[in-house]
Amino acid sequence: MKLILTHEVSGLGTPGDVVEVKDGYGRNFLLPRNLATPWTKGGEKQVETISKARKARAIASLDEAKAVKQSLEARTVAFAARAGRGGRLFGAVTPADVALAVSAAGGPTVDKRKVEILQPIKTTGTHKALVRLHPDVSATVTIDVVEATA
């Protein structure tokens, strides 16, 4: 099945890519979640539109991505969450929470889909998260999770 990706799918491609996948994967996973659209003759225009939008949103140059990386790695992001005894959180810190905390701390706006938490953050303390800024540049963000005061 030939599809046009509308969102980034790890291991498959980025928005605007034309991919060939098995029918079941396309019908049961990609299409229902609006991660892709079927390839049509009018798909050429859609690919161009998606790639233009992606370029407008993406960090344009490698130099700019490196500058943002230095900015992110230089700061520690504080995040307050409700916790029980022993510093165990009620829930977990999600990539969306990390993206919001980075923006609130005065950092650049980060897309939650670009934040990768390698180990679930379920306790207070210092943790690390990876932010993919550019295909060649990733920044490691230090997150300091503290107990929220009521």
Curated annotation (Swiss-Prot):
Family according to the record: Belongs to the bacterial ribosomal protein bL9 family.
Q: What is this protein called?
A: Large ribosomal subunit protein bL9
What UniProt keywords are attached to this protein's entry?
Answer: Ribonucleoprotein, Ribosomal protein, RNA-binding, rRNA-binding
Keyword Ribonucleoprotein assigned to the entry: answer is yes
The GO molecular function terms of this record are: rRNA binding; structural constituent of ribosome
* Gene Ontology CC annotation, any one: ribonucleoprotein complex
* Biological role stated in the UniProt entry: Binds to the 23S rRNA.
Any Pfam family the entry gives:
Ribosomal_L9_N
Organism (species): Kineococcus radiotolerans (strain ATCC BAA-149 / DSM 14245 / SRS30216)
Q: Which GO terms describe its biological process?
A: translation
Q: Please give the PROSITE patterns that the UniProt record associates with this protein.
A: RIBOSOMAL_L9
Indicate whether RNA-binding appears among the record's keywords: yes
